[in-house]
């Protein structure tokens, strides 16, 4: 879908709606305040690095698990020294930590949680209103935090 223009998603046969948010392709990535790592540290997305951010509804779903495992496996074979990879969800930091350990996820992926106030989820326009969860997406940003591309599948059960 086109972020900022299309606000309808599907969960199977059910219609869902995205918040509008402030993020747009060509614009700046909204500030990521109050994100928390699995180690319970406050985290801000760093400036000056190329980023690929995966937002997922919940790591405790089969689709999210498959998506992140595939990402982790792909990073074991690539040199990604110039790009940083992030997974953001509203899962608690404890749930993220468990997921990382149980699934042997690559340390090249930084997990962060927006569980506390959902600010990043709302400001990016990726909040599914009916579920109060992130839409599944991939956000690509350059070193200046300019959003280069946002991929959001129409059906949240599909991997972008």
Which sequence ranges carry the predicted segments?
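Chalcogenol-based redox active-site neighborhoods
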Residues: 1-160
